[in-house]
């Protein structure tokens, strides 16, 4: 049994502290069970385009720290949904875990059915359009958040085989040398990027500027680093061996002027890659 506590002080009254504490305990338990915890967002999508019989589907996991553009990219998928997506199921909005099954595939799970999203990063007016099912936290502050139900417990616990394992890069500009979607060529290259956990902090925490955290996840992995390193090595080796696309997605959320367009273009770039399986045209 694992036990944790939050001091009964006003400065610890922020909902996120309680949420992250619970998730930290969850991550530790997952590592003890042989699963790799992740700080990221995962979605199962099915595309339109005459694919109902053949099935163009993809399970996408975006890993990254706070303000990396994970939830915002999922929000962009939602906005693009009417045109390109037949079905979209959010499996994990913030935390989850990965296990290697008997066939060597990566199976990913979520942890919670709700999303804890910054108001400033949502499409204008969206949160208030969901007011009947939303809980809005500290709307007068910079780090104002809204809690929205986004997944079912069945999807959270089902376990989906991964097709794309991506790091959400919010700090690099896009150019010919740095494409929106960059695929890695080896486990070592991928581990270097994921382990560094770089993110351009937006002032939504106590950090600002380019900061680093071990695997973009301070909630368990640093405290059990030896176990985590072993699990991460096995997971990334299995990813390349089983054909999972591993890389980084440049969301540009941390670059001024790209708060909305960055995640949207990242979502479009990812959709274009998935749509190459069929003749579906997606504008840049």
Name what the model sees in each region.
Residues 9, 48-50, 67-68, 113-115, ...:
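Short, glycine-/Ser/Thr-/acidic-enriched flexible segments
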Residues 48-83:
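Glycine-rich phosphate-binding P-loop
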Residues 32-33, 80-88:
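Secondary-structure transition/capping motifs at alpha-helix termini
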Residues 140-284:
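Conserved NTP phosphate-binding and transfer environment spanning the P-loop NTPase/kinase superfamily
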Residues 13, 17-21, 68-72, 90, ...:
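Generic recognition of stable, solvent-exposed alpha-helical segments in well-folded globular domains
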Residues 85-155:
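Conserved nucleotide-sensing/catalytic segment adjacent to the nucleotide-binding pocket
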Residues 1-39, 245-253:
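Charged, amphipathic alpha-helical linker segments immediately N-terminal to NTP-binding catalytic cores
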């Amino acid at each position: 049994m694992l036990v944790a506590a939050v001091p009964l002080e006003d400065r610890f009254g922020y909902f996120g502290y309680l949420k992250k504490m619970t998730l930290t305990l969850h991550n530790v338990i997952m590592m003890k069970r042989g699963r790799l915890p992740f700080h990221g967002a995962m979605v199962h999508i099915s595309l339109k385009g005459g694919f109902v019989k053949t099935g163009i589907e993809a399970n996408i996991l975006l890993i990254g720290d706070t303000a990396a553009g994970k939830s915002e990219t999922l929000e962009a998928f939602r906005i693009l949904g009417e045109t390109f997506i037949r079905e979209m199921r959010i499996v994990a909005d913030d935390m989850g875990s990965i296990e290697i099954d008997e066939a060597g595939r990566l199976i990913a799970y979520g942890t919670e059915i709700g999303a804890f999203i910054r108001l400033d990063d949502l499409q204008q007016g969206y949160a208030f359009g969901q007011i009947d099912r939303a809980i809005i936290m500290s709307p007068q502050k910079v780090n104002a958040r809204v809690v929205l139900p986004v997944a079912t417990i069945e999807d959270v616990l089902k376990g989906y085989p991964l097709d794309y394992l991506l790091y959400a890069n919010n700090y690099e500009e896009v150019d010919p040398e740095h494409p929106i979607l960059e695929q890695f060529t080896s486990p070592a290259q991928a581990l270097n990027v994921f382990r560094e956990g770089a993110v351009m902090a937006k002032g939504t925490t106590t950090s600002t500027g380019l900061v680093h955290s071990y695997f973009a996840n301070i909630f368990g992995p640093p405290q059990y680093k030896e176990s985590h390193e072993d699990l991460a090595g096995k997971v990334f080796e299995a990813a390349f061996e089983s054909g999972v696309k591993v890389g980084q997605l440049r969301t540009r959320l941390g670059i001024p002027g790209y708060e909305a367009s960055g995640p949207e273009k990242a979502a479009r770039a990812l959709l274009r890659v998935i749509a190459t399986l069929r003749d579906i045209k997606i504008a840049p």
